[in-house]
């Protein structure tokens, strides 16, 4: 995992940093296309298939088509579709349309026609039957008129085969994809001067015929060590004359299609930066054992095939996970090991994949339970996570946290032994409605917040606020202290004080009453 940069990208998801994430498996993608691309920032066609009625797609036309193509070349017999109206002006609702299917994008079969349809309220979902017995890769909703406005909008489209939704919102393809076919480049920052002798390229479907492998020590002066006009795609292993460089660039000058796509770029040699873990856990003055730094690791959940019971086993192998910063967001962990460009510098947030970080992640750590906790009631405390979390200790699920700013305290006495190793695993859930990327400009700051507010309590401003850009991942992670504490079997918890004043005389004396809850374990 090293920071990588691109000359352009086709969207906010397929950015250069994905060429060093260690994932060489390029999945096909569902493709969403529309007749008109004049939608405002934050109201893109992707909103139609995000599963949230709180977002929408808008075009400045009274008509226009919307097309969905299934991922990985899949085809389905869609016999029902559902449309959801948007949040405001009913005059923008579709009124007349056709619904068609195709396997090549050229020849379309009409499956349904509707006229004079009216939504009775905002964010209302209406279901329609399609007379269909054939499987198609693509489906198109062609809106021929709306209810009277010069703009058309919808919140959601869903496609069903025998009452099973075929919109797969979990597909993620780890690749960089350029915005065009003209000369394009991606380069990797190795973090320090290294000796390089080989580069391995893992191409997507859209590979370069003509390209160069270039080296640099300063990002300004580049020298080419390899050049070809006969690129073959797939996996290309290029042996090089050993050279020193801090930056390695793939410079593409000719390809087979309208884009270039690259799943992974591996650089071989000697040298390089080795991330180091933070300070080890320590005992606080109040007797709490703080698990700051130490052995924390983090990994995207899609790359972990086991469940929490197995991940929280102390012998679980997490060698391919990255070192985590705790407390901190997932994005902070990747930044601190040099795996992504610094999003606080210039417009470099556009170099970081939103889809990669807007996902579920696993955290885990191992530690030795303090001997001083022997014969005590032992507690695991998490002072703050975002967005939601499932918590596991030594192969047992101990509880969950249902939102940011909510503290979690779990009795782990049955699962740990003083003086022995223990493991904590925390599954962090992404936001249900993370919203779309907004790009600020001199003409518009974009929206303040947005649909992310439906997930409150969460970090609402992370979707974008005034001229603050959208944070990749929406600040999910373990954001506050994690520590172990010990008590006796009876504790006084949740204390609070009530002040009784003898009004109107508020000077002579005050009566204080203390209240608490007795926790008897």
Named regions from a protein language model:
Residues 1, 8-14, 24-28, 38-112, ...:
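Aromatic, loop-rich ligand-recognition surfaces of beta-strand-rich domains
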Residues 116-122, 229-232, 401-404, 416-417:
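Short proline/glycine- and polar residue-rich coil/turn motifs
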Residues 510-517:
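Conserved small/polar residues in nucleotide/adenosyl-binding loops
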Residues 499-508:
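Short, solvent-exposed loop/linker segments at the N-terminal edge
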Residues 63-67, 80, 183-187, 198, ...:
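Intrinsic-disorder/low-complexity, polar/charged segments enriched in Ser/Thr/Lys/Arg/Asp/Glu/Gln
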Residues 223-225, 237, 247, 282-283, ...:
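Accessory beta-strand-rich segments of carbohydrate-active enzymes
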Residues 1-41, 161-166, 262, 269-344, ...:
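Accessory carbohydrate-binding/adhesion or oligomerization-edge regions at the termini
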Residues 55-58, 128, 174-178, 351-355, ...:
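Beta-strand-rich interaction surfaces with strong enrichment in secreted/lumenal proteins
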């Amino acid at each position: 995992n090293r920071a990588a940069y691109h000359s352009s990208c086709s969207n906010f998801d397929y950015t250069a940093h994905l060429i060093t994430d260690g994932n060489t498996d390029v999945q096909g993608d569902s493709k969403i296309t529309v007749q008109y691309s004049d939608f405002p920032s934050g109201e893109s066609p992707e909103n139609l298939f995000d599963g949230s009625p709180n977002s929408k797609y808008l075009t400045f036309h009274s008509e226009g088509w919307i097309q969905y193509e299934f991922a990985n070349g899949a085809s389905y017999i869609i016999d029902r579709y559902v449309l959801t109206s948007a949040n405001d002006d009913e005059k923008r609702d579709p009124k007349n349309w056709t619904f068609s299917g195709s396997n090549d994008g050229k020849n379309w079969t009409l499956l349904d026609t509707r006229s004079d349809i009216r939504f009775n309220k905002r964010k209302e979902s209406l279901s329609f039957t399609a007379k269909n017995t054939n499987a198609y890769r693509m489906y198109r909703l062609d809106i021929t008129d709306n209810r009277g406005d010069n703009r058309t909008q919808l919140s959601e489209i869903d496609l069903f085969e025998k009452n099973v939704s075929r919109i797969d919102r979990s597909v993620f393809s780890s690749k960089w994809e350029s915005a065009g076919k003209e000369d394009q480049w991606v380069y990797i920052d190795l973090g320090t001067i290294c000796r390089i002798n080989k580069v391995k390229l893992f191409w997507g479907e859209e590979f370069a015929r003509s390209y160069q492998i270039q080296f640099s020590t300063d990002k300004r002066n580049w020298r080419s060590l390899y050049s070809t006009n006969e690129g073959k795609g797939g996996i290309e292993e290029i042996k090089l004359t050993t050279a020193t460089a801090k930056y390695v660039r793939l410079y593409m000058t000719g390809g087979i299609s309208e884009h270039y796509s690259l799943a992974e770029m591996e650089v071989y040699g000697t040298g390089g930066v080795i991330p180091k873990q933070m300070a080890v856990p320590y005992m606080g003055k109040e007797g709490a054992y703080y698990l700051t730094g130490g052995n924390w690791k983090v990994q995207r959940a899609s790359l972990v095939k086991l469940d929490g019971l197995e991940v929280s086993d102390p012998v679980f192998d997490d060698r391919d996970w990255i070192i985590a910063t705790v407390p901190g967001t997932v994005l902070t962990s990747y930044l601190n090991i040099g795996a992504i460009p610094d999003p606080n510098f210039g417009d470099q947030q556009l170099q970081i994949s939103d889809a990669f970080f807007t996902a579920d992640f696993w955290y885990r750590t191992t530690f030795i339970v303090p001997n001083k906790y022997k014969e005590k009631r032992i507690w695991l405390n998490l002072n703050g996570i975002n967005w939601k979390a499932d918590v596991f200790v030594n192969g047992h699920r101990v509880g969950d946290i249902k939102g940011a700013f909510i503290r979690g305290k779990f009795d782990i006495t049955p699962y740990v032994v003083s003086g022995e190793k223990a493991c904590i695993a925390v599954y962090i859930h992404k936001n249900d409605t993370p919203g779309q990327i907004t790009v600020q400009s001199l003409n518009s700051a974009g929206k303040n917040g947005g649909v992310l507010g439906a997930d409150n309590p969460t970090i609402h401003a992370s979707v974008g606020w005034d001229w603050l850009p959208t944070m990749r991942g929406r600040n999910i992670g373990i954001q506050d202290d994690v520590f172990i504490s010990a008590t006796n079997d009876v504790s006084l918890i949740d204390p609070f004080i009530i002040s009784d004043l003898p009004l109107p005389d508020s000077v002579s004396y005050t009566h204080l009453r203390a209240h608490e809850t007795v926790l008897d374990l």
